[in-house]
Regions:
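Active-site entrance/lid segments in N-terminal catalytic domains of soluble metabolic enzymes
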Residues: 1-184
Length: 184
């Protein structure tokens, strides 16, 4: 395993595209100087995230940007190659977020230029959907098994998940799966 001791101060998830290259570079430079991590957001790892050498938390959402097949499903080989970069210190699997629990998203094709297409592994000029749920797994046990697979493919880096839940039952089901599968 490759444990990572995170600072109490880190940079929250914000994708390149939502923020400019200058903003991403400045945030990553700050992470390098401050010795804390910079979360990429679900848009993938851009050259601007790695330019200054700050530690990265690579966030992977339902669109699997930067590690997807043409049909939008998870691509293990692309994930393995990106996750094993030295600068990527940990991985965050985004299940849902408070602003839009249970909803996907859509990036209009007009915003998918050559650079965005390359970073996200999508087609230039085409609308890109982020489904409301992951296609790589189903249910709590599927989630925990997928987390373990991501950990193994990354060479033992820490893998966590981000979620917004509507009931305690959902959270307890994930905890039960972790205990049953002995994946922590």
């Amino acid at each position: 395993t490759k444990p990572y001791l995170a600072s109490r101060f880190n940079i929250s998830a914000m994708s390149y595209g939502s923020l400019s290259k200058t903003a991403i570079e400045a945030l990553n430079w700050g992470a390098k100087i401050g010795d804390f991590f910079h979360n990429t957001g679900e848009g993938g790892i851009s050259p601007y995230h790695i330019k200054h050498g700050g530690d990265l938390c690579w966030q992977i959402g339902t669109g699997y940007f930067g590690c997807r097949n043409n049909d939008g499903t998870f691509n293990r080989e692309m994930y393995k190659a990106s996750s094993q970069q030295d600068q990527v210190k940990l991985i965050e699997l985004k299940i849902s977020q408070g602003a839009k629990p249970g909803h996907g998203g859509m990036l209009p094709g007009s915003k998918v230029d050559e650079e965005i297409a390359k970073i996200r592994a999508v087609e230039i000029g085409k609308d890109v959907n982020s489904p409301p749920k992951h296609s790589a797994f189903n249910g709590p046990k599927g989630l925990i098994n997928f987390v373990q697979e991501l950990r193994e493919l990354s060479g033992g880096k820490p893998v966590g998940f981000k979620l917004c839940i509507g009931s305690k039952h959902e959270f307890f089901a994930i905890c039960k799966a972790m205990l049953e599968l002995k994946v922590y």
